[in-house]
Curated annotation (Swiss-Prot):
Span of the annotated motif Bipartite nuclear localization signal: 69-86
Biased composition (Pro residues): 552-562, 575-585
Identification of the protein by name: Dual specificity tyrosine-phosphorylation-regulated kinase 1B
Organism: Homo sapiens (Human)
Any one of the GO CC terms: chromosome
Length: 629
């Protein structure tokens, strides 16, 4: 019986016709399979993990080999076809719109440029020799950009306003001598000053200066803030920090505040992001309205840093900054946080209505909680100063530290209205002369010097110096302490030094301390000076101003602070030698830092319009110019 095709016992095997179709597929199978499996060392997973460095090296070798071959194969370029570099301001400016400084260049047939001593976001600062007055000066050259010019015009207006109310230069504000336009750059001529307070700290290897020198610095800074708070001025500095406080002389404790590039007047606030982070006040961090009290907060931070050698609040960002403040001072008042637009950036509201610190990824692992890092421990009130380094030293008793701690805490009040005012600070017990201090410094009427040996006998230091006369940047400047100015001194020994170390206002203990009035308009019931005539030196019983014997500076970096003459004798802060310095053959021949009298800016020569820009009459610049910046 015939079996139908496909139904036999071997029906699962292909028939003759199907076999011929399958055979080609079987023959192609070996071609599709690799002859050998890939080496494990060349697997992508290994190349991107264990052998990642080798992979990168191989990529670099291949890349640069191809680049070299392309360079060899490319035809030589004709120099005439090269793209010409863009020329700015007829070749006088660089790509950043800064003036290209050339040593030896003479401006207005008067200023001979010596060297560049500083650079910042505003522009540059150069040291120059004024042939008309035979003095060294510092010239701040503003960038050739409209926004920077507008902001510099505001700074210029404030500086001229302060100079009008401080004709004797005794309120520790940098003196603007004159201004002019040169090749489309606004140039501000300042007195040439010495090192800043950060350089002074650096010279102590960040161990801090004595409490006595801290007191002298605090007294001058409070006087300067009192001057700025007069109703005729009402100026907020907005960037008070050690880098913006300069010594007049490297051997004296006289200081001056510089860099009013971020400053404003009450009621005319321009920016919200102001102050360097370490010295930024809580109201600025929280986004609430601010007034002159923000400078008092910065001053409190500065005083602690000057004595301990380290910033009190050294936050890495704004959140960390607030955390460090809370760590010392506790949670801010609920009434303040309720009105703060940025309160929830740092804090969380509790169900009961209070506030607690916001737990974020930015919170430090070593954070100890609100109020756990006490200021008493930071200052070493009961342990002989910071790290016990001042134990047994005269003027560093627990009573001295308690007065210092109380003053700082009053400066660091959260509420701006409760923060101590400059006048109240000058009346604080920290500046009063006690019986123990009189014993340490000798009789009040004694003329015998109790100061250390002349500074010329101290060993020289290899620390690099840093000088500033007016520069700096806005509150958004870097907190990495860029050293903007550098210079050296030359000179010789000078006359002996008279030390009147403990001169300070004598205020009866019963007189109460008045808090800061707060707000944009001075409060009538608070002890705000009615005019400049009520400031120190014009009738009010406030700290006398420093007067200094002429003494040329040291050829080295800042002296050890303990060898500085910290005397403050009645009279204006004088940074000049006893006699006018003769004109050197070249500005580099002498780096003696002096003070000269002011004057009106000279008009540019009319026969040189190509070289000089038009004279700019910037007196009385309206505040509206700030809008474009």
């Amino acid at each position: 019986m015939a079996v139908p095709p496909g139904h036999g016992p071997f029906s699962g095997f292909p028939g003759p016709q199907e076999h011929t179709q399958v055979l080609p597929d079987v023959r192609l199978l070996p071609r599709r399979l690799p002859l050998a499996f890939r080496d494990a060392t060349s697997a992508p997973l290994r190349k991107l993990s264990v052998d990642l460095i080798k992979t990168y090296k191989h990529i670099n070798e291949v890349y640069y080999a191809k680049k070299k071959r392309r360079a060899q194969q490319a035809p030589p370029q004709d120099s005439s076809n090269k793209k010409e570099k863009k020329v700015l301001n007829h070749g006088y400016d660089d790509d950043n719109h800064d003036y290209i400084v050339r040593s030896g260049e003479r401006w207005l047939e008067r200023y001979e440029i010596d060297s560049l001593i500083g650079k910042g976001s505003f522009g540059q600062v150069v040291k120059a020799y004024d042939h008309q007055t035979q003095e060294l000066v510092a010239i701040k050259i503003i960038k050739n950009k409209k926004a920077f010019l507008n902001q510099a015009q505001i700074e210029l207006r404030l500086l001229e306003l302060m100079n009008q109310h401080d004709t004797e230069m005794k309120y520790y504000i940098v003196h603007l001598k004159r201004h002019f336009m040169f090749r489309n750059h606004l140039c501000l001529v300042f007195e040439l000053l010495s090192y800043n307070l950060y350089d002074l700290l650096r010279n102590t290897h960040f161990r801090g200066v004595s409490l006595n020198l801290t007191r002298k610095l605090a007294q001058q800074l409070c006087t300067a803030l009192l001057f700025l708070a007069t109703p005729e001025l009402s100026i907020i500095h907005c960037d008070l920090k050690p880098e913006n406080i300069l010594l007049c002389n490297p051997k004296r404790s006289a200081i001056k505040i510089v860099d009013f590039g971020s400053s404003c007047q009450l009621g005319q606030r321009i920016y919200q992001y102001i102050q360097s982070r370490f010295y930024r006040s809580p109201e600025v961090l929280l986004g609430t309205p601010y007034d002159l009290a923000i400078d008092m907060w910065s001053l409190g931070c500065i005083l602690v840093e000057m004595h301990t050698g380290e910033p009190l609040f050294s936050g890495s960002n704004e959140v960390d900054q607030m955390n460090r403040i809370v760590e010392v001072l506790g949670i801010p008042p609920a009434a303040m946080l309720d009105q703060a637009p940025k309160a929830r950036k740092y804090f969380e509201r509790l169900p009961g209505g209070g506030w607690t610190l916001r737990r974020t990824k930015e919170l430090r692992k070593d954070y100890q909680g609100p109020g756990t890092r006490r200021l008493q421990e930071v200052l070493g009130v009961q342990t002989g100063g910071p790290g016990g380094r001042r134990a047994g030293e005269p003027g560093h008793s627990p009573a001295d530290y308690l007065r210092f701690q109380d003053l700082v805490l009053r400066m660091l009040e959260y509420e701006p209205a409760a923060r101590i005012s400059p006048l109240g600070a000058l009346q604080h017990g920290f500046f009063r002369r006690t019986a123990d201090e009189a014993t340490n410094t000798g009789p009040a009427g004694s003329s015998a010097s109790t100061s250390p040996a002349p500074l010329d006998t101290c060993p020289s230091s290899s620390t690099a110096s840093s000088i500033s006369s007016s520069g700096g940047s806005s509150g958004s400047s870097s907190d990495n302490r860029t050293y903007r100015y550098s210079n050296r001194y030359c000179g010789g020994p000078g006359p002996p030094i008279t030390d009147c170390e403990m001169n300070s206002p004598q205020v009866p203990p019963s007189q109460p301390l008045r808090p800061w009035a707060g707000g944009d308009v001075p409060h009538k019931t608070h002890q705000a000076p009615a005019s400049a005539s009520s400031l120190p030196g014009t009738g009010a019983q406030l700290p006398p101003q420093p007067r200094y014997l002429g003494r040329p500076p040291s050829p080295t970096s800042p002296p050890p602070p303990e060898l500085m003459d910290v005397s403050l004798v009645g009279g204006p802060a004088d940074c000049s030698p006893p006699h006018p310095a003769p004109a050197p053959q070249h500005p580099a021949a002498s780096a003696l830092r002096t003070r000269m009298t002011g004057g009106r800016p000279p008009l540019p020569p009319p026969d040189d319009p190509a070289t000089l820009g038009p004279h700019l009459g910037l007196r009385g610049v309206p505040q509206s110019t700030a809008a474009s910046s």
